[in-house]
Amino acid sequence: MRLVFAGTPEPAVVALQKLIDSEHEVVAVLTQPDARRGRGRTLHPSAVAELAQAHGIEVIKPTSLKADTGDGRLVRQRLAELQPDCLPVVAFGQLITRDLLDVAPHGWVNLHFSLLPAWRGAAPVQAAIRAGDQLTGATCFRIDEGLDTGVILSTLEETIQPTDTADDLLTRLAYAGADLLVDTMTGLEAGTISPREQTGEATYAPKITTVDARIDWTVPAEVIDRHIRAHTPGPGAWTMLDDARLKVGPLVTVTDLPDVPTLNPGALHATRDAVYVGTGSTPVALGQIQPPGKKMMNAADWARGVHLDQEASFE
């Protein structure tokens, strides 16, 4: 099939590469405009744009797909000229307007990293870890006017491991989902896919903000563990110590807590080799800490460097 791929960040690159390597023809790519990154705040193309350019594929970078914008009109004109059979989508980052939904015979097919209708929205991987789900997956569905409400074309399941960070899980889903997306394109072309409506209770995973990533030390230890893993690496779980905001890496698994006193939520206890924090249940052992303006470091090394007061407590 002739495909116009829509995607932007690194997880979408895996799917684009799989489509390029498949029997299908990627004739163009839609992606977000260049963004400023790094200390110099210089403009950089998206990960998807870089891959497409390396393969000589046309790249279109609209600021909006709305029909009343210059970019929106350009996209409509170009799609009419390209005549794609389908538009696969992976984390594109822009709203597909109603009048564009029928621009191709097979429509727009989104690869979403959850088992819909669970975790509709922008952050399904983080939501699944935070909620303590043991099973998630990926869904290819046809985009309609709703928020991830379209008919399901294909799915796969993926077990969430007890130590998975959002990055760990997203990486596995990106690779497995890329194969699923290619198979879905092939199935649509062959006419072997039977779309089905979504059933069951819907849950939602809105975009995560920095405020959302703050750690609440009053909740049970297992909830804090999931919270930290769900926000690793970005935006990064964080807490306050005095007036400093510290990022907190995944916790260290400990089987027992020798010589660790009873700790109130947030209270710190440092030994030679470890740093413990009180929670709403049992204390937890910190793995890594990132002080302001510095890189992640071993929590025990950090504690020695700042000479923790016996009354020190995270807020």
From Swiss-Prot:
Gene3D superfamilies, sorted: 3.40.50.12230
Keyword Nucleotide-binding set for record: no
GO cellular component: cytosol
GO MF term set: methionyl-tRNA formyltransferase activity
CDD domains according to UniProt: FMT_core_Met-tRNA-FMT_N (cd08646), Met_tRNA_FMT_C (cd08704)
Catalytic activity: L-methionyl-tRNA(fMet) + (6R)-10-formyltetrahydrofolate = N-formyl-L-methionyl-tRNA(fMet) + (6S)-5,6,7,8-tetrahydrofolate + H(+)
EC number(s) stated in the UniProt entry for this protein: 2.1.2.9
Positions with a binding annotation for (6S)-5,6,7,8-tetrahydrofolate: S114, L115, L116, P117
Keywords: Protein biosynthesis, Transferase
Primary enzyme class: transferase
UniProt cross-references to InterPro entries, sorted A to Z: Fmt, Formyl_trans_C, Formyl_transf_N, Formyl_transf_N_sf, Formyl_transferase-like_C_sf, Met-tRNA-FMT_C, Met-tRNA-FMT_N
The keyword Protein biosynthesis is annotated on this UniProt entry: yes
Entries under Pfam families matching the protein: Formyl_trans_C, Formyl_trans_N
Known function: Attaches a formyl group to the free amino group of methionyl-tRNA(fMet). The formyl group appears to play a dual role in the initiator identity of N-formylmethionyl-tRNA by promoting its recognition by IF2 and preventing the misappropriation of this tRNA by the elongation apparatus.
NCBIfam families in alphabetical order: fmt
HAMAP family from the UniProt entry: Formyl_trans
PANTHER family in the cross-refs: METHIONYL-TRNA FORMYLTRANSFERASE (PTHR11138), METHIONYL-TRNA FORMYLTRANSFERASE, MITOCHONDRIAL (PTHR11138:SF5)
Family: Belongs to the Fmt family.
Name under which the protein is recorded: Methionyl-tRNA formyltransferase
Organism: Corynebacterium efficiens (strain DSM 44549 / YS-314 / AJ 12310 / JCM 11189 / NBRC 100395)
